[in-house]
A protein has these predicted regions:
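Helix-helix packing/entry segments at the starts of transmembrane helices
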Residues: 48-50, 106-112, 191-214, 244-284
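Membrane-interface interhelical linkers
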Residues: 1-23, 55-82, 127-136, 153-173, ...
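Transmembrane alpha-helices of multi-pass small-molecule transport proteins
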Residues: 2, 16, 39-89, 112-120, ...
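Specific alpha-helical transmembrane segments that line the substrate/conduction pathway
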Residues: 46-57, 86-87, 95-134, 138, ...
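Residue-level signature of transmembrane alpha-helical cores of multipass secondary-active transporters
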Residues: 20-21, 25, 79-84, 95, ...
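Specific transmembrane alpha-helical segments of multi-pass solute transporters/efflux pumps
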Residues: 27, 31-34, 60-110, 120, ...
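Transmembrane alpha-helical core positions of polytopic small-molecule transporters
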Residues: 25-29, 83-91, 113-114, 149, ...
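Hydrophobic transmembrane alpha-helices of multi-pass small-molecule transport proteins
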Residues: 59, 81, 112, 119-120, ...
Length: 316
């Protein structure tokens, strides 16, 4: 059997897709702030499970209103369940990893995802081959993202090295979970782009992921004793509404719609902007600090994105 999958050709990004991806990354970056502001009242895994549950209901209602079938047998069940499991596994790895390593180190390892996405698409999906200049762009963007979090990354590593041997091993395990989260994120994109899901509606693709992840995450929350809400505050309700309606429903639906029309590897590199937006919103809304190094890092990320999306030279 061939290792590649022939699918309808996707096109390079136009100005609309670029602006939409920047907007989506800003939404995802603000989500980091929303989660931070709610963690004290709603445990993170329970938050994620509630988010997926609410968003799944919204996707069902949206599909029903548009007459989009979600339960018709179209041969996507296997790929849909796999994508859902991978989607849930990403959040499980992030949660468990953050109990063992720092947020900065998790960010660096999690955002290896665009690198793994590019590799997976290059190997398994026709029409997603990347040129050398595009691989350079991936590397430059990742370097910029890593530079943005270098202080926290190195500080956490030094602290672990100065601690007990067990702390060092725990930190390494947390880092490994960060990489695994990046791999599962990338694998989700590859499954969606390289299977029958590429031929189905964005609503159905998202419904698979939300329903499976809701079951997995809520079950994990029960197992961890996290099914509780300390205090119902307006801020907590607003944060959960933002995560469920804006992020998990609207932005993910738009993301999967983009995957049906544009080259996935060129879209995925924009995700390097997400932690940059997260830092920016943290500075603006939470009063967090940042250094001049962050501006250099942002420039590197933008340069890398430009290289990945640079048009190929036409031959006579």
């Amino acid at each position: 059997m061939s290792t590649t999958t022939a699918l309808p050709a996707r096109r390079a990004l136009d100005s609309f897709a670029i602006l939409l991806m920047i907007g989506l990354c800003a939404i995802w970056g603000l989500q980091q702030v929303a989660i931070k502001t709610t963690n004290a009242t709603v445990p993170p895994v329970f938050q994620a499970g509630l988010r997926s549950t609410i968003a799944a209901v919204l996707v069902w209602a949206w599909a029903r209103s548009r007459g989009t079938p979600l339960f018709r047998d179209d041969g996507t069940l296997g790929a849909g369940l796999l994508a859902g499991v991978l989607f849930a596994a990403e959040f499980v790895c992030i949660f468990l990893g953050l109990t063992l390593t720092s947020a900065s180190r998790m960010a660096v390892f999690l955002y290896t995802a665009p690198c793994f996405t590019a590799l997976g698409l290059h190997w398994f999906v026709d029409g997603e081959r990347m040129r050398r200049i595009q691989w350079l762009g991936i590397g430059v963007a990742f370097l910029g993202m890593a530079l943005a979090f270098a202080d926290g990354f190195l500080h956490a590593g030094a602290a672990a090295g100065a601690g007990a041997h067990g702390s060092t091993l725990a930190g390494a395990a947390g880092d490994a979970l960060g990489v695994l989260a990046g791999i599962t994120w990338a694998a989700t994109t590859v499954v969606v782009r390289g299977s029958r899901l590429a031929h189905t509606s964005a609503s159905k693709t998202l419904f698979y992921q939300l329903t499976v992840s809701a079951v997995v995450l809520l079950a994990l929350a029960v197992g961890l004793g996290q099914v509780r809400v300390e205090t119902v505050t307006p801020l907590a309700l607003a944060s959960l509404a933002y995560q469920a309606v804006i992020v998990a429903f609207v932005s993910y639906l738009l993301w999967f719609w983009l995957l049906t029309r544009y080259i996935a590897s060129r879209l995925s590199v924009f995700s390097f902007l997400t932690p940059m937006f997260g830092v920016t919103f943290g500075v603006l809304l939470l009063g967090e600090s940042f250094s001049a190094r962050f501006l250099i890092a942002a420039l590197l990320v933008l340069t890398g994105i430009a290289l990945v999306n640079a048009p190929a030279k036409r031959t006579a």
